[in-house]
Amino acid sequence: MAGMVLGVGAGVFLLALIWVLVLLLCVLLSRASGIARFSIVFVFLGALIITTVLLLFPRASEFPAPEGEMKIVDAFFIGRYVLLAFLSAVFLGGLFLLLTHHLLEPIYAKPLRSC
């Protein structure tokens, strides 16, 4: 089943996004004055209508079709190792620069005062 994250489809995330945006808009409109404050009711009713439409008219069937055996292929195998080699070289270069500029920094003796 394509498009599933954490065992739920895209519709659940769409509904969550709609309600988060509606609640944010309601909070912002509650600070308004005049007739704009009463538009909260229309925003809430609009989100309620969209939610009922999405719940009552689903796109997919309730029972998914059985899938065939899936063969897992790593198409980015070489690229992943090139990226790993590059990041390892950058890490070792940064470690070398840290060693030369910070840990091996010379400490000069302060001159003694002569009387």
UniProtKB/Swiss-Prot annotation:
The chain crosses the membrane at residues 5-25, 38-58, 81-101. It is found in: Membrane; Cell projection, Cilium. The keyword Transmembrane applies. InterPro entries: Tmem218. It comes from the Eukaryota. It comes from Mus musculus (Mouse). It is a multi-pass membrane protein. The lineage of its organism: Eukaryota, Metazoa, Chordata, Craniata, Vertebrata. Disruption phenotype: Diffuse renal cyst development with tubulointerstitial nephropathy and disruption of tubular basement membranes in essentially normal-sized kidneys. Retinal lesions characterized by slow-onset loss of photoreceptors. Interacts with TMEM67. Coiled coil: none annotated. GO terms for cellular component: cilium; membrane. This is Transmembrane protein 218.
